[in-house]
Regions:
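Metabolite-binding pocket within alpha/beta catalytic cores that recognizes anionic/polar moieties
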Residues: 9-157, 161-162, 217
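Flexible, glycine/charged-enriched surface loops at secondary-structure junctions
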Residues: 64-68, 172-177, 264-267
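His/Asp/Glu-rich mid-to-C-terminal helical/loop segments that flank catalytic regions of hydrolases
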Residues: 232-267
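Generic non-transmembrane alpha-helical segments
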Residues: 162-170, 214, 254-265
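Zn-dependent metallopeptidase/amidohydrolase metal-coordination segment
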Residues: 209-244
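Active-site rim beta-loop-alpha module in soluble metabolic enzymes
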Residues: 153-198
């Protein structure tokens, strides 16, 4: 990877020189929020506003924290579920924002086990049709992950086999495979789609590489599953499944069961 980049760019290391573990960060979350809190262990990362509003309406939710930003604060809630207290929040979209939110929520609440679910684009309709997608690796086509993990093309999704066991025990249809994390859906070009497919990617999304990198860096446990909404086929872009993939409630109740059953000691 490094040889390839250096050859192409004449030795200019650019983004691959961003991983620095030899000096301390100047900006720390304590500067904004004070000391770290320890309120919950598990948290769900919600992308769908429809699902988020359903949760607020149907569960006895309690706000426990707030992530502050100049363009609007994001509340963090808890809900009770089968003798568990589980946090949740509506995340911004995109690798940098979604990953940064996980770090802030950990500081504000103590949650270190994160369940993330949402829609994606299928690169292989035959493989993904009617199945939940459990990513095994994510192509790092974004920027944030290079600050939190050594430069490589792909990052491993370390809890994929634990999730696969959960799905298998419940006889839920699923497929495991590589995915592509991109920063720009408008640059999912024919050549790039073809290249990612040749490498074994079955889906494309916009958060996972960064979220996994920051989770690995800080010692969080991430459980991620996806549902294909659109299909990227050259000359025939299909969008029929987008609404269901984004907003159907089956993913919520599945995520709640995952949160309940993943017995991992939080930090």
């Amino acid at each position: 990877f490094l040889v390839k980049i250096n050859k192409i760019y004449g030795g200019n290391r650019m983004i691959i020189d961003s991983y620095d573990i030899n000096s301390e960060p100047i900006v720390k979350l304590e500067n904004f929020y004070g000391e770290k809190q320890h309120l919950v262990k598990k948290c769900m990362v919600i992308f769908s506003k429809v699902i988020y509003e359903y949760m607020l309406e149907k569960f006895p939710c309690r706000q426990i924290a707030e992530v502050r930003a100049c363009n609007g604060n994001i509340p963090v809630w808890t809900l009770p579920y089968e003798e568990e207290t589980i946090a949740f929040y509506l995340t911004p979209i995109g690798s940098a924002l979604a990953a940064g939110m996980i770090a802030e929520v950990n500081h504000l609440t103590g949650a270190s086990v994160f369940i993330m679910f949402g829609s994606c684009g299928s690169l292989d309709k035959e493989a993904t049709d009617g199945k939940f997608i459990l990513p095994t690796e994510a192509y790092r086509g974004e920027g944030l992950s290079y600050y939190f993990a050594e430069p490589q093309d792909y990052i491993k999704i370390k809890n994929t086999d634990k999730l696969a066991e959960f799905f298998k025990e419940r006889k839920l249809p699923y497929v495991q495979g590589r995915v592509w994390t991109t920063d720009s859906m408008l640059r999912e070009t024919v050549n790039l789609v073809r290249k990612r497919k040749e490498e074994g990617c079955i889906a494309v999304e916009m958060e996972l590489a960064g979220v996994q990198a920051i989770s690995d860096f800080y010692g969080f446990e991430l459980y991620d599953f996806l549902v294909a909404g659109d299909v990227l086929i050259e000359g025939n872009y299909e969008t029929d499944g987008l609404s269901a993939a984004n907003h159907d409630l089956d993913k919520l109740f599945l995520a709640l069961q995952i949160a309940k059953n993943m017995r991992i000691e939080g930090r």
